[in-house]
Design a protein with these regions (language model features):
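Long, charge-rich, low-complexity alpha-helical segments
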Residues: 33-94
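N-terminal first-folded block
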Residues: 1-31
Length: 94
């Protein structure tokens, strides 16, 4: 399954930094792990609950988490962006 353009744009919101949460995927610019957002959704929180609890997030950030996890489950190879020292580093596909 190929990524749609809007999904590609959403995935740009998911980054990782080895210095934050051991390199787990996070929402770009925030110390919020994708797994935290997915866990809260799985526990019954709504988008509105998350946006109220984390007012710095945007709806697209939550959607990006869902797209990211969907791609993992679908066994798609995705490459999150490495952000280190406030610089973006792209991983090379093997």
């Amino acid at each position: 399954m190929r990524l749609k353009t809007d999904e590609k744009e959403l995935l740009k919101r998911i980054t990782y930094n080895p210095a934050i949460f051991g390199g787990k995927p996070i929402i770009r610019g925030h110390r919020i792990a994708v797994e935290h957002i997915i866990g809260m959704l799985a526990a019954g929180s709504s988008f509105e609950d998350l946006l109220e609890g984390y007012p710095f997030l945007e709806k697209a950030d939550i959607q990006a988490c869902l797209v990211y996890v969907h791609r993992l489950v679908a066994h798609e190879k995705i490459e999150p962006l490495l952000v280190k020292d406030n610089k973006t580093h792209y991983r090379r596909k093997k």
